[in-house]
Structures are given as C-alpha cells and as structure tokens.
Amino acid sequence: MRLVDTSAWIEWLIGSPTGEAVTAHLPEQSDWLVPTMVQLELTKWLTREVGEDKTDQVIAFTQLCHVVPLDTEIALAAAEACRVHKLATADAIVFATARVHDAVLITCDAHFDGLPGVTRIEKIKA
C-alpha cells in the first residue's frame, strides 16, 4: 500500500516536473490509501486553485481508492508523531495513517525526511 501526501498530489495534478517524478511512485488505485485529511487538504487547495468541477473529479477518484477516516488508533499515533517528530497536526495524521496501515508515504515535503516508511520526491526546480 502507498499513501500519497497532499504535496505529491498537488505536484502530480499540476503536471510539474516534480509531478512527473511522483508518477513513477504512484500505485494502482487498489493499493492507494487516501486519509480523509488528504481529502480535506485537496478539497481546500483544488477549490481555491481550479474550481469545484475539478475538485469533484479528484475527490471522486479518491473514493475509488482506500479512503481511511481518522479513528482513535490513528489519532493516538498522530499525537505520538507530533511529540516525537515535531510534525504539525495534519502531517502527523497523514504519517500516522501510513504507519498504522503499513503503507509507504509518498511526499514532496522535506519535513518528512528521515522518518521511517517515507519516500520523499525531491522538488525539481523548473
């Protein structure tokens, strides 16, 4: 299983050079975990940047993947990730979701560097 962080989603959706690098790491939909936190962040970004039609399309795509709601196990693991790794709450929820589900976290965010189970795609300057 793979969990694609919002940063990697955005790079992929805009078709940036970094997004092209992300493409090589994307799983089949059946192996793609999508935390509800990522759905929230994507909806915020997409609505602001490209409008509701594109937002609806992307969220419909996510619903064909394995959507993972925030539950107590993930919340407690996220609190621990905040404490141990100094992650912001949303990042900790995404990281904890990946860990709880034994998934690889695909991200473009440097603040995940060095964390277990993380594959970071370096941002490519255009």
Predicted segments with their positions:
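Active-site neighborhoods of divalent-metal-dependent phosphate/nucleic-acid chemistry enzymes
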Residues: 67-108
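A generic structural signal for short hydrophobic patches within well-formed alpha-helices
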Residues: 9-10, 39, 75, 112-113
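General small-molecule cofactor/ligand-binding pocket signal
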Residues: 33, 68, 121-122
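Short, well-structured N-terminal submotif of metal-dependent ribonuclease cores
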Residues: 1-34, 46-59, 126
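Structured helix-beta-strand junction loops
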Residues: 28-29, 61-65, 101
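Short hydrophobic interaction/assembly module
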Residues: 54-73
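Acidic, PIN/NYN-like endoribonuclease modules and their adjacent C-terminal/linker elements
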Residues: 1, 95, 99-126
